[in-house]
Amino acid sequence: MKTYAIGDLHGRFQPVRDFHLRHNTEKEYNKADKFLILLGDSGLNYYLDSRDKTFKKKLSKYPFTYFVVRGNHEERASNIARNNPDWQFENFWGGIVLVEKEFPNIKYAMDYPAFYNIPYIGNHEHDLTYIWRALVIPGAYSVDKDYRLAMGYSWFKDEQLTEEEKDVCLKDIEDAHYKCDFILSHTCPCVFEPTDLFLPMIDQSTVDKSMEQFLGYIEFLMDYDCWLWGHYHKFRDYPRTDGKKKIMLMHEVIDLEQVYKEDTVEVL
């Protein structure tokens, strides 16, 4: 059993294909059940037409069960599933996910913050399974919202968390005693925003930072081992001044077990 994570795909299957081709001759890779966490803006529910289905079919060629964290450039799975018999709820990783019947290997995390139990082999000699407790926080603000609206491109009005969803998250982390192993999100706490990557044509005074500020509060409250996010289209392994691992991903793939156990991050 192996669990990996990757950042934004934006409808491109090639990073997944290339990762698989780099490792499909390895014995350990081939014998393991493989899970791939997509950290938002995957492009699976972007066009809401046959183009999405084509992308899902391409991803389904590869031997992964996908766990999808919602970003900002995609529709909420719960909106698509509403009154749609082709979608159903499932129990997965100790939580609830949405699944489209045609693509049972693609599991969509809830559109609100939720905890999941990610299984891993903690003792390979005796094949003993343990779990990581993971807090999943979806959503982000689209800095190119006005451009998208002007050009007729997709923009999703409920891309960010609602205040009610944030309140539920705060209650959930209190119930969890403010502790988990992983935090998985699309955007990141405000203190970790890569300002050097901000688009120069965007007036930052017009950007809604409420999601990043909320995540900053979560970061202050939570005792965690590793936080993974995407959104900014760059790989970055942040300094660990407090001992916590903070990793930003784009097309890079990482192994959660390696990241959890070791001080360095190996890009696969």
Residue positions per predicted region:
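Binuclear metal-dependent phosphoesterase catalytic core
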Residues: R22, A81, G216-L221, Y232-L268
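Beta-strand-turn-beta hairpins that frame and shape the catalytic cleft
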Residues: M1-Y4, A114-V136, F182, R240-M248
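Cap/insert and terminal regions of metallo-dependent hydrolase folds
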Residues: G43-L44, T54-K56, F67, D181-G230
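Active-site-proximal loop/helix segment associated with metal-binding centers of metalloenzymes
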Residues: E90-L98, I121-K209
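Core catalytic region of metal-dependent phosphoesterases/phosphodiesterases
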Residues: I6, R12-L128, Q204, S210-E212, ...
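A general structural motif
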Residues: M1, K31-D33, P63, T129-I131, ...
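Divalent metal-coordination and catalytic microenvironments
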Residues: D8, L36, D41, G71, ...
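Short, solvent-exposed loop/turn segments at secondary-structure junctions
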Residues: H10-G11, G43-N45, H73-E75, G139-V143, ...
